[in-house]
């Protein structure tokens, strides 16, 4: 997909589809009003006949003649007074999804009306970034082992229109960032959707290596089981004890900041399949346990985004990857292992394996003396029970970091909710 800005006036815009905003009060504003006037107030008729009511997610495609654009796409944006980045994202995603079902190859978005209500000082950046992210979100489809019923996507170019010179730079940056974030998110989803017989720890290594080889500031180190044993990572090795598929510890270093800058360390849980081990899970929906590596896939996606944008930071991405399966060599309930930190751990339930691999990964990551450490994991379904499907659980021993991550979630519509992590829980940990 090619993303670009378009500085031409409305009557000179050449595209298959021209997207404009329609709110539920029926009042056309800004660009929508100009497009309506240029087309004999055609849109007024659609609103009057209630062919478009301005509801979020409602989209209508109108053919026009005698213009440099072939179609006008009416994008429902809800209540004008409630317009927000979240509603804009929903509206844009719905419109792009509708357009992707046609054979149109290009689109220019003029869905700017109401942008002043977006709660962010850099509104141009937000509009363009969300536009690019939304395309990647709606265009993702799993194809590796599925060949039928796939959507044919003809759309090749998405532009965002502007008549302001000052906004061009911010719009371009937003498109660049949104494209990189969108592609990284697609990778995360793809790795999660792959079956466990393809997405093994070794496969994750190959994906990470391909990413890191593209950037001269990036290096990759992979620890095998013998190296982990030498480092006394017995907590992690106890989880993989029953598996024939070898465990891997991916350590990807990205040094593009100053030498004095302490790195940010990201650790992602990579259980490529979790049967529960000897403490076997119920068979119903066990196939979904291929998603127990989504902490790892998110870490690898973040790795791709950071290296593609060549961000001026130092970062280390650590992925402990293995399978948790039962066999005659598997760890048994009641076994005691000693972690890399020297802590002895009694394994009462082998289905509590996430904390075991993360314990050694977090201990190993400390040798980088990080500025901060972020751990991402599908650690327990109890978090979903507590928060539902809309918020990610956030726990931190730093109020400042927790606040920053919370604000990041708010500004990107990927929201978190902080859960307690106090001394009161120490005995249970």
In which residue ranges do the predicted regions lie?
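A generic structural signal for tightly packed, nonpolar segments enriched in small/aliphatic residues
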Residues: 51-53, 57, 205-429
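Short amphipathic alpha-helical segment within the helicase RecA-like ATPase core
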Residues: 1-270
């Amino acid at each position: 997909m090619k993303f670009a800005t378009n500085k031409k006036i409305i009557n000179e815009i050449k595209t298959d589809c021209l997207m404009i905003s329609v709110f539920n009060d029926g009042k056309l504003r800004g660009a929508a009003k100009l497009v309506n006037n240029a087309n004999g107030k055609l849109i007024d008729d659609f609103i009057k006949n209630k062919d478009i009511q301005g509801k979020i997610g409602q989209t209508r495609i109108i053919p026009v003649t005698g213009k440099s654009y072939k179609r006008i796409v009416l994008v429902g944006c809800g209540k004008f007074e409630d317009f927000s980045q979240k509603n804009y994202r929903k509206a844009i995603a719905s419109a792009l999804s509708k357009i992707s079902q046609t054979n149109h190859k290009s689109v220019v978005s003029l869905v700017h009306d109401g942008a002043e209500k977006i709660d962010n000082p850099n509104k141009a950046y937000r509009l363009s970034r969300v536009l690019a992210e939304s395309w990647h979100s709606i265009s993702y489809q799993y194809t590796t082992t599925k060949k039928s019923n796939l959507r044919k996507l003809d759309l090749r170019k998405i532009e965002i229109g502007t008549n302001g010179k000052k906004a061009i730079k911010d719009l371009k940056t937003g498109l660049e960032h949104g494209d990189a974030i969108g592609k990284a998110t697609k990778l995360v989803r793809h790795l999660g959707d792959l079956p466990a017989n393809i997405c093994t720890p070794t496969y994750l290594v190959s994906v990470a290596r391909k990413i890191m080889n593209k950037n001269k500031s990036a290096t990759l180190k992979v620890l095998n089981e013998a190296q982990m044993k030498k480092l006394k990572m017995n907590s992690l090795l106890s989880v993989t004890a029953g598996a024939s598929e070898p465990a891997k510890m991916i350590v990807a270093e990205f040094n593009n900041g100053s030498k004095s800058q302490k790195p940010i360390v990201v650790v992602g849980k990579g259980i490529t399949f979790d049967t529960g081990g000897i403490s076997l899970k119920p068979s119903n929906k066990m196939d979904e346990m291929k998603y127990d590596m989504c902490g790892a896939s998110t870490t690898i996606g973040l790795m791709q985004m950071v290296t593609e944008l060549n961000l001026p930071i130092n970062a280390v991405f650590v992925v402990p990857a293995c399978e948790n399966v039962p066999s005659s060599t598997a760890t048994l309930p009641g076994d005691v292992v000693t972690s890399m930190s020297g802590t002895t751990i009694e394994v009462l339930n082998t289905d509590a394996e996430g904390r075991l691999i993360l314990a050694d990964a977090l201990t190993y990551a400390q040798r980088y003396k990080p500025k901060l450490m972020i751990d991402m994991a599908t650690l327990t379904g109890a978090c979903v029970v507590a928060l539902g499907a809309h918020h990610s659980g956030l726990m931190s021993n730093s109020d400042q970091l927790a606040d920053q991550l919370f604000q990041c979630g708010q500004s990107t519509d990927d929201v978190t909710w902080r859960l307690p992590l106090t001394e009161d829980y120490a005995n249970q940990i």
